[in-house]
Amino acid sequence: MTAQAALATAANDGELRHDWSAEEIEALFALPFNDLMFEAQKVHRAHFDANRVQVSRLISIKTGSCPEDCSYCPQSAHYATGLEKEKLLAVEEVVESARQAKEEGASRFCMGAAWRGPKGDDFEVAVAMIEGVKALGMETCATFGLLDKWQAQRLKEAGLDYYNHNIDTSPEHYSEVITTRTFQDRLDTLDVVRDAGLHVCSGGIVGLGETRTDRARMIQTLANMPKHPDSVPINLLIPIQGTPLADAERPDSFDFIRTIAVARITMPKSFVRLSAGREGMTEEMQALCFLAGANSVFCGQKLLTAKNAAPGKDKSLFGKLGLQPM
């Protein structure tokens, strides 16, 4: 399969595909950089205003002591990263954070918790948080780990709009990164979320020691879901001392930008989020990511426990590029 053949069937005309082969997607990755950027921008402009970016804020509502062993995560109880465990935040504190985020230009407020999955009273507190944030007129998003059908429906009734559950990497590379839950566990939770009528937010991480084929397989898995994720976060690994990936080699910047572009081409109507890792990117790299089809970012100085681009930097960058928040 040539890249030209793959592009001929890409969704420039509004028809969404769910039958991408790994070979087609690898052919897109292999395009000359300028050609790939041009094609991604064409697809982007067919479905979005290329100069508008959706802005979200993400906070950790419960930090540390997670029982999972995700080898990139400082919140895992399996690793000594020096992260201080924090109990579940109070509802009022979360709602106030959301209010501040709205004042700073965020339209969506995302809440993350270091759980395998929500349980008991903690779940009900999280439900109250969602209700409180929704009352501010913001879109709501949560990432609480594995969900069952009842929990997903309860979150929907509380006013949750989006549920994030990343697949992280390819099915083949997954067990090299995480062993405490399976790739299928993640897909099952996404099915539950979709069936409850929630918008799906799901993407992955570049820099986990994966190959280009792994990146293609990750994109293939996302693009071939029954419905494309409404939001596709593409993260650049932030190496954290104490985790197994602390000394992981930083991916080539152009490989990361290619991943953004291929996600845009294969999932034309999805928001592609330039997610974790922006703090370590130059303005020029971020600009190329927007040119490749990224149209969503997280604002605020932290993403859960990781550093993020400060609001002032984003305002400056948006001004230089002529971008406007949605």
UniProtKB/Swiss-Prot annotation:
Q: Which domain of life is it from?
A: Bacteria
Q: Which cofactor does it need?
A: [4Fe-4S] cluster; [2Fe-2S] cluster
Binding, [4Fe-4S] cluster: C66, C70, C73
Q: Does the keyword DNA damage apply?
A: no
Reaction catalysed by this chain?
(4R,5S)-dethiobiotin + (sulfur carrier)-SH + 2 reduced [2Fe-2S]-[ferredoxin] + 2 S-adenosyl-L-methionine = (sulfur carrier)-H + biotin + 2 5'-deoxyadenosine + 2 L-methionine + 2 oxidized [2Fe-2S]-[ferredoxin]
Could you tell me which InterPro entries the record lists for this protein?
Aldolase_TIM (IPR013785), BATS_dom (IPR010722), Biotin_synth/BioAB (IPR002684), Biotin_synthase (IPR024177), Elp3/MiaA/NifB-like_rSAM (IPR006638), rSAM (IPR007197)
Domain Radical SAM core, by residue range, is 51-278
Has keyword Acyltransferase? no
How, per the record, is the cofactor bound?
Binds 1 [4Fe-4S] cluster. The cluster is coordinated with 3 cysteines and an exchangeable S-adenosyl-L-methionine. Binds 1 [2Fe-2S] cluster. The cluster is coordinated with 3 cysteines and 1 arginine.
Matching PROSITE patterns, A to Z? Answer: RADICAL_SAM
Per the record, the GO terms for biological process are: biotin biosynthetic process
Q: Which residues bind [2Fe-2S] cluster?
A: C110, C141, C201, R273
Give the molecular function GO annotations: 2 iron, 2 sulfur cluster binding; 4 iron, 4 sulfur cluster binding; biotin synthase activity; iron ion binding
* UniProtKB keywords: 2Fe-2S, 4Fe-4S, Biotin biosynthesis, Iron, Iron-sulfur, Metal-binding, S-adenosyl-L-methionine, Transferase
Under PANTHER family, the record lists: BIOTIN SYNTHASE, BIOTIN SYNTHASE, MITOCHONDRIAL
Please give the name of this protein: Biotin synthase
Please tell me the species this chain comes from.
Answer: Paramagnetospirillum magneticum (strain ATCC 700264 / AMB-1) (Magnetospirillum magneticum)
